Each structure stands twice: as structure tokens, then as C-alpha cells.
């Protein structure tokens, strides 16, 4: 068990104590963890006084808000982890309740953005991870995440977090003589999400962002005397996001990208 308290003292927002406690129990290959923590965050100078021209081209402005209140949160976590042989896996869950969460959203003019305190905000999530490390140099890893976020303003959920996501990785590395070859396939899928935003007329409009899949492939070879070659393909399946101008998690729109590098380590090259 580990417990502690963090104290904050601010000339404007006063004194605040934030306790935290963590527990861990091990039984054979199983490890159980749990914890509770209280958070306290005062608005930053950027969140209070920003007047930033996004991109420097007059597209839109990001404004601070001098009326922001400190953000207070309470979070509870639980997790279970198993490690046996080539396998490692875990399941974890968390719940966070925010009071006066500081967020960035559309300003009252309907064009620019401004920081604000959400009326009510919660964040609930579950993470599942599994990994296999084989003796032949192959490693497989996969993870699933579920998150349910509510950041309400006037009864509308302004959060744009995608509720479901999957990530996977396959790595292979093998030495042939004095040459080491490697390959890595990485991918991520994110579900669609519906969110609300405030338009220029002061009304609330619901918008949906479609699901997306993004993958990459990387190949590498390491030779004696410090020589190394790498080649990669980004956006392997040529995914192009229709919502890139509005979505917070931007995916490149240039299509498939090819990367190649050849490098040499001078220190290794000059070794006798």
C-alpha cells in the first residue's frame, strides 16, 4: 500500500489538498492493483489569457477565459495482470468524475474557440491488453480500449472521444549471419463518434465522425560496420478521413507514404 497527499496553495484559488492511495496484491502469476486519487488543476496562463491566431493565417482564434475555475477530479482504478511464459495480459478499468473540467470548445461567436468549464464531466474506461513473445523472434501485441466521456454544456455532450479503439502490433526480428533483419506491422482502428457543437446562431448541432483505420509497415536491416537500412509504408490502406478539418485526432490526408533511409554509425565504421 502506498498513500500520499499533494498540497497546492495559490494566491487566487487558495489552498487545496489532494489525497492518493494505491494498493497491490500478488498471488502466483496474478497481480491485482487498485487505487483512488483526487486531482486539482488550476487554469494555466494559456487557458486564462490566450489570444492565439491558429496557423497564423486568420483561420480562427483561440481565446482564454479569465473566469475559469480550478478543475477538481476524483478517480478510482482497478486492474488485473497475468504473466506466464510467453504471455502477458491485463484488464483495467477506471472512473473519473470532474467538477468544473477545463475544456476547449467553440466560442459564442460560432467561429473561434475558447476555454470553458464544463457543467458536468465523467470519464469511464476499460483497457484490455495481450502480448505474446515467441522464442523465434516474433512478438504479437493487441489492445482494446473503451471510453465513455461526458462533458456537458447546457445538457449537450460536447466530448468527441471515440468510444472504441483497437491497436495491434506484429514485430519480427531475426539474425542471419552478421545481418539482422526486422519487420513491424502496426495498426489502429477507431470507432465512429457523435458529438455536439455550438453554431454561430447560438444553437447546438449534432455531428458524426466516421470510423477510421490506419496501418503502417516498417522493414529494417542492420549490417556490420554500422550500416543500417530502413524502409516503410505509412497509411498502408490509403485511408483518407472526411472529417480532418474538424476532428481533433487528425489523420494525414496525403494518402500512402513511402519512407526509406540508409545510415551509418561512424564509430562502428572506424572500429578495427
Model regions and ranges:
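Gram-negative outer-membrane beta-barrel transporters
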Residues: 94-97, 116-197, 237-240, 261
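Residues on the lipid-exposed face of transmembrane beta-strands in outer-membrane beta-barrel proteins
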Residues: 21-25, 78-82, 128-132, 142, ...
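Repeated loop/turn-to-beta-strand initiation elements of outer-membrane beta-barrel proteins
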Residues: 1, 29-32, 86-89, 136-140, ...
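C-terminal beta-signal and adjacent terminal beta-strands/loops
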Residues: 99, 140, 189-198, 219-272
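Surface-exposed extracellular loop regions of Gram-negative outer-membrane beta-barrel proteins
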Residues: 1-20, 130, 136-143
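Outer-membrane beta-barrel signature, preferentially recognizing the C-terminal barrel domain
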Residues: 31, 38-98, 107-133, 159-164, ...
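Transmembrane beta-barrel strands of outer-membrane/channel proteins
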Residues: 3-7, 21, 34-38, 47, ...
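Outer-membrane beta-barrel translocator domains and adjoining extracellular loop/strand segments
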Residues: 13-19, 46-51, 58-59, 101-109, ...
Amino acid at each position: 500500500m502506498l498513500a500520499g497527499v499533494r498540497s497546492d496553495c495559490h494566491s487566487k484559488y487558495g489552498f487545496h489538498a489532494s489525497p492518493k492511495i494505491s494498493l497491490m496484491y500478488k498471488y502466483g502469476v496474478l497481480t491485482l492493483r487498485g487505487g483512488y486519487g483526487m486531482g486539482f488543476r488550476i487554469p494555466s496562463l494559456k487557458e486564462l489569457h490566450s489570444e492565439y491566431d491558429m496557423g497564423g493565417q486568420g483561420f480562427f482564434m483561440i481565446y482564454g477565459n479569465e473566469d475559469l475555475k480550478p478543475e477538481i477530479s476524483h478517480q478510482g482504478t482497478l486492474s488485473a495482470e497475468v504473466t506466464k511464459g510467453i504471455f502477458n495480459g491485463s484488464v483495467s478499468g477506471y472512473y473519473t468524475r470532474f467538477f468544473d473540467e477545463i475544456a476547449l470548445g467553440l466560442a459564442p461567436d460560432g467561429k473561434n474557440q475558447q476555454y470553458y468549464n464544463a457543467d458536468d464531466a465523467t470519464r469511464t474506461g476499460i483497457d484490455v491488453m495481450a502480448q505474446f513473445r515467441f522464442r523465434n523472434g516474433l512478438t504479437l501485441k493487441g489492445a482494446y480500449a473503451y471510453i465513455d466521456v461526458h462533458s456537458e454544456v447546457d445538457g449537450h455532450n460536447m466530448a468527441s472521444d471515440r468510444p472504441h479503439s483497437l491497436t495491434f502490433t506484429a514485430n519480427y526480428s531475426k539474425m542471419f549471419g552478421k545481418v539482422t533483419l526486422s519487420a513491424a506491422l502496426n495498426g489502429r482502428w477507431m470507432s465512429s463518434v457523435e458529438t455536439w457543437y455550438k453554431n454561430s446562431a447560438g444553437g447546438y448541432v449534432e455531428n458524426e465522425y466516421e470510423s477510421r483505420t490506419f496501418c503502417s509497415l516498417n522493414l529494417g536491416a542492420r549490417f556490420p560496420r554500422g550500416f543500417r537500412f530502413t524502409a516503410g509504408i505509412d497509411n498502408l490502406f490509403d485511408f483518407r478521413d472526411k472529417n480532418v478539418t474538424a476532428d481533433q485526432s487528425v489523420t494525414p490526408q496525403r494518402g500512402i507514404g513511402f519512407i526509406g533511409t540508409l545510415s551509418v554509425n561512424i564509430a562502428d565504421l572506424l572500429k578495427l
